Amino acid sequence: MAVQQNRKSRSRRDMRRSHDALTENALTVDQATGETHRRHHVTKDGFYRGRQLFAKAADAE
């Protein structure tokens, strides 16, 4: 089992974690439907870049 030779300081630990922060998703409003969605992703209605790519699935009964 690997065991560290020397204890790492808080500074070294925090510097290693400096790139671990999460960023918020970029949201945009669809031109056709006005629905808010993530950029470069298809909306729930099946629209992408103003075009309908697929029909919305009917509710399962």
UniProtKB/Swiss-Prot annotation:
Any one GO cellular component localisation term in the record:
large ribosomal subunit
Q: Identify the stretch(es) annotated as Disordered.
A: 1-44
Q: Which GO terms describe its biological process?
A: translation
Which residue windows does the record flag with biased composition (Polar residues)? Answer: 25-34
Source organism's superkingdom? Answer: Bacteria
Q: Annotated Gene Ontology MF terms?
A: structural constituent of ribosome
Keywords, ordered alphabetically:
Ribonucleoprotein, Ribosomal protein
Transmembrane domains' residue ranges: none
Q: Where is the composition biased (Basic residues)?
A: 7-16
The family database entries (SUPFAM superfamilies) matched by this protein are listed as: Zn-binding ribosomal proteins
Q: Which family does it belong to?
A: Belongs to the bacterial ribosomal protein bL32 family.
Q: Return the protein name.
A: Large ribosomal subunit protein bL32
| Lineage, opening ranks | Bacteria, Pseudomonadati, Pseudomonadota, Gammaproteobacteria, Moraxellales
What's the encoding gene here? rpmF
